[in-house]
Amino acid sequence: MLAPIMDSSHSKFRIVILAPKGLRTGGPEAMHQLHHAIMQLGKNSLLVPLPGTRNRISVQQYSKYDPIWGEIWHTRRNDIVIIPESLGQLPLWYFFFISRQNLFLWMLSVDFSYENQFQKYETKNFKIHPAWLKNEQIKLRLKNFKAQKLIMKFFAMAKLQYVKFRNRYMRSRINIDFNNYLFQSAYAREVFRAINDTNSGVMLSDYTNFENKQKIRKPVFCTCTKKHIAYFPAKSLNLISLILDINASRGGLIHFIPIQGLEPSQVIALLSESDLFLDLGYFPGKDRLPREATSLNCPVLLAKRGAARFKEDFPLPSMYLLDLEKLDPESTFEAITKVLSKGKKFNSRAQSKFQEAVCAEKPLFIKEVDNLINLLNNF
């Protein structure tokens, strides 16, 4: 839907959200949720595609948020513009339509921020047990990567020269006032405040949209009698592969099932039927999959990395948070089997606070959005 240009007499300003159109991940969904909440609270809002995504098709699954898409030239200079943390520059001509002082940055993640001090923050500042780094598969991947790197070097250099030219002459770096930062997680808030020695910024989380999931007809995913562990191979596969090797060496007692190439109903079925959801990666923010898992009564076992180090983000008992700085792969596998031995019902009850926190996300988010609107009215 294309937004009409609103008359300034009806509203002092609109809240414009620059979002990647056509991308289905946690960040873009949060932006749609924000847009929807603002509209529900009676304030005008507009989604504007990030540069390079204008011609993409809007994600069909996000139609439930009633998105109103517009163009950058539909904005007014008194509009508030919210951008994601990964956006460090904008085309110069954008600033004919928007004001720099009205830019707000939403830190949906820490480690994927355009700002150098935040990039890969977790991996740079918190190491894992060296045994995780001795994986022969990793060495092979590095070898292959080096070979590919040589082949791609010429093309990369050409692209780099173009990017340098574009950034210098065609784009403008974005500098955000500390007071104009919004934080999706306690992890983002605390890292930002520690690095910048400030108490500035406002919390603006998101929520896990598990409404009506129970009404979806769930296919039977697996009928074997083994314990089932769901995992997301697109994240931390180099670590998970070591666990899979250990499991195979012990006769494959556990059935590890990847969340990969599945329809939404299949993901729901897998998480509903699994005894555990395992994630050994770092959490640049409050990742959705662990929250979706617990909303489907699937216990989680997470690496204590990134946002998982903060109780405010993941209120889990310590036995469900794996300290990979101390635990090697063998010890981690033992911890996994120990958790499984407790049984799904026990683990679910032990994680009741996490489940309650996830259930309370939406009303909390609406309250945060309402608070943000009130702050902006006095901006």
What are the functions of these language-model segments?
Residues 18-22, 50-51, 82-88, 108-109, ...:
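Structural motif
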Residues 2-5, 16, 54-135, 139, ...:
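Extended catalytic core of nucleotide-activated donor transferases of GT-like folds
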Residues 1-80, 301, 308, 320-321, ...:
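N-terminal pre-catalytic "stem/leader" segment of glycosyltransferase-like enzymes
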Residues 272-285:
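Acidic donor-binding loop of glycosyltransferase active sites
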Residues 264-274, 295:
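Short acidic alpha-helix that forms the nucleotide-activated donor recognition element
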Residues 29-30, 163-267:
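Conserved catalytic-core segment of nucleotide-activated headgroup transferases in glycan assembly
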Residues 76-78, 177, 272-273:
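Alpha-helix C-terminal capping/helix-to-coil transition sites in glycosyltransferase folds
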